A protein has these predicted regions:
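A general structural signal marking secondary-structure boundaries and capping sites
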Residues: 3-8, 65, 114-115
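Conserved loop-alpha-helix segment in the C-terminal half of the alpha/beta-hydrolase fold
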Residues: 41-91
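Catalytic active-site module of serine/aspartate enzymes centered on a nucleophile-bearing elbow/loop
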Residues: 82-115
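Alpha/beta-hydrolase
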Residues: 1-52, 56
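Short aromatic-enriched loop/helix-cap "lid" or pocket-rim segments at secondary-structure transitions
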Residues: 13, 73, 98-100
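Short linear functional motifs in flexible/disordered or boundary regions
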Residues: 8-12, 70-72, 88, 115
Length: 115
């Protein structure tokens, strides 16, 4: 959880505090039971080079303390034509929680450009 979000408390957004209603069967089938080493159905899946074929506006958002490391985010950014990448300092995977106002402003700006 340290790369996703800080510990939850009464001030955490409701969407994070509410009880999850979904299971993890599909995740375990696809990825496997180990978070850090894929051994499920997706273990040999690699879409990296196909990113060059994307023809839609793409916004890549990541945090400096994210499981999607800056290297991974930059790999996507370098391959998706015309992509934009925003790296949020001092943020984990849930940048919309860590820096909500900055995140919302970025989304509004980006959506206005492509809507």
């Amino acid at each position: 959880m340290r790369h996703c979000n800080s510990p939850l408390n009464e001030n955490s957004p409701e969407c994070l505090r509410r009880e999850a209603k979904i299971g993890n069967e599909s995740y375990i089938t696809a990825w496997g039971p180990n978070e850090f080493t894929p051994i499920g159905n997706l273990k040999d899946f690699n879409y990296t080079e196909k990113l060059r074929n994307w023809k839609v506006p793409s916004l890549i958002i990541s945090g400096t303390s994210d499981l999607c490391t800056p290297l991974l985010a930059k790999t996507m950014y370098d391959r998706i034509p015309g992509a934009r990448w925003e790296l949020f300092e001092d943020s984990k995977h849930l940048v919309y929680v860590d820096q909500n106002e900055k995140y919302i402003n970025l989304l509004i700006e980006w959506l206005n450009k492509y809507d």
